[in-house]
Curated annotation (Swiss-Prot):
<feature type="region of interest" description="Disordered">
    <location>
        <begin position="65"/>
        <end position="108"/>
    </location>
</feature>
<comment type="similarity">
    <text>Belongs to the UPF0229 family.</text>
</comment>
<dbReference type="InterPro" id="IPR006698">
    <property type="entry name" value="UPF0229"/>
</dbReference>
<dbReference type="Pfam" id="PF04285">
    <property type="entry name" value="DUF444"/>
</dbReference>
<protein>
    <recommendedName>
        <fullName>UPF0229 protein Pmen_4018</fullName>
    </recommendedName>
</protein>
């Protein structure tokens, strides 16, 4: 007898494969809908699914059929209106539509196909082909991670991991092996008893002897236990090394008085998108939140996104604090260090060259990637031009982009973290 063991991850959801095939087929429609959803959603509404509409004309299956036009001779049974040789006028073309015109008794069409993608699928499409650039495998002593995988069957294990089917199968095989000869003798004894009762009903001594033998064999068979400790089988799980990269992301946000509420909202959206991306795609990553005005301080996630504290503008305070935290907690030989900075570009004039020097001399030589987004519809100011010098010196690990409105967040985010081809 053969056994089929279904170890697919989606074994209980048989339609998952078909759904994945469908999502691959209409990937362009879904990606476009996801991009539109990201640009219109609120700050706290980034992790929900989305309703996708696909035009009916795009879901038609290719079929073989007769082409339009041409001449055909067709006999319609039961037709009393026309006779042989008469020409039937072509029907007027009609089509369904969704316009605002008057109702009609002709024409037909097809509504758009609408379906829902889950939260997981939404985030998959949102962060598709994105990654942290220049991520290097850096080893930490004693910090290896492991994942639990199935490694067959064991005779010992935790009762919660008992494999019932394999246990019963083993017990059945053991009972057959231990009682096989007794069962064969029992069948022979029963056949002999039936013969004696039929052919020699008066031979009481032999009949009693056979009956005693049957009882003895039956007792021997029943003494074989239904289940023995030898039969117990357990699912064996082992820990498999799972190499991982240690990374830290510094999030630096300007909350000075020059940042309007709309500008702060765009900055928060950018960082929430970054935060979701990091938490979803990387198991071993730490996030350091830094808010700054005239002074900078490290805060938790709640205060970073929702604190109302404000003040003047000295951008270098955030960079100095970042450098101090790097030196204190994140050795460069063990950590991949990343940073993302958001500001409206306003800064105390004498401070912008200081920011450039800190980046070039104290931060950029030790980080994998640094991104700067300037949120302003106006012309760039001194800070942007100082950062351009940083970009020239570190063209592979420094990037800067401008955000004008919330609609620019997702395209700029994808451009900053687009997966790069490695030659």
């Amino acid at each position: 007898m053969s056994y089929v063991i279904d170890r697919r991850l989606n074994g209980k959801n048989k339609s998952t494969v078909n759904r994945q095939r469908f999502l691959r087929r209409y990937r362009e429609h879904i990606k476009k809908a996801v991009e539109e959803a990201v640009s219109r959603r609120s700050i706290t509404d980034m992790e929900h699914g989305e309703q996708i509409s696909i035009p009916g004309r795009d879901i038609d299956e290719p079929v073989l059929h007769h082409g339009r036009g041409g001449k055909q001779t067709i006999v319609h049974p039961g037709n009393k209106e026309f006779t042989a040789g008469e020409r039937i006028p072509r029907p007027q073309g009609g089509g369904g539509g969704r316009g605002s015109g008057k109702a009609s008794n002709s024409g037909e069409g097809m509504d758009e196909f609408v379906f829902q993608i889950t939260q997981e699928e939404f985030l998959d499409f949102m962060f598709e082909d994105l990654e942290l650039p220049n991520l290097v495998k850096r080893h930490l002593t004693g910090a290896d991670t492991f994942k639990t995988v199935r490694a067959g069957i064991s005779n010992e294990g935790n009762p919660s991991r008992i494999n019932i089917i394999r246990t019963l199968r083993s017990a059945h095989a053991r009972r057959i092996a231990l009682s096989g000869s007794s069962r064969a003798k029992l069948r022979e004894a029963k056949a002999e008893l039936l013969r004696l009762r039929t052919e020699e009903p008066d031979n009481f001594s032999d009949i009693q002897e056979i009956e005693a033998e049957i009882e003895r064999l039956s007792a021997r068979i029943h003494r074989v236990p239904f289940l023995d400790t030898f039969d117990l089988k357990y699912n064996l799980l082992t820990k498999q090394p799972n190499p991982s990269s240690k990374a830290v992301m510094f999030c630096l946000m300007d909350v000075s008085g020059s940042m309007t509420q709309a500008t702060k909202d765009i900055a928060k959206r950018f960082f929430i998108l970054l935060y979701l991306f990091l938490k979803r795609n990387y198991d071993k990553i730490e996030v350091v939140f830094i808010r700054h005005h005239t002074s900078a301080k490290e805060v938790d996630e709640e205060e970073f996104f929702y604190s109302r504290e404000t003040g003047g503008t000295i951008v270098s305070s955030a960079l100095k604090l970042m450098q101090e935290i790097m030196a204190e907690r994140y050795p460069i030989n063990e950590w991949n260090i990343y940073a993302a900075q958001a500001s409206d570009g306003d800064n105390w004039n004498d401070d912008s060259p200081v920011c450039r020097d800190i980046l070039i001399n104290q931060i950029m030589p030790f980080v994998q990637y640094f991104t700067y987004v300037e949120i302003t519809p106006r012309e760039h100011q001194a800070l942007w031009f100082e950062y351009e010098q940083v970009a020239e010196a570190f063209d592979e690990s420094f990037a800067q982009q401008q955000l004008v409105s919330a609609a620019d967040i997702y395209p700029v985010f994808r451009e900053l973290f687009q997966r790069r081809l490695v030659s």
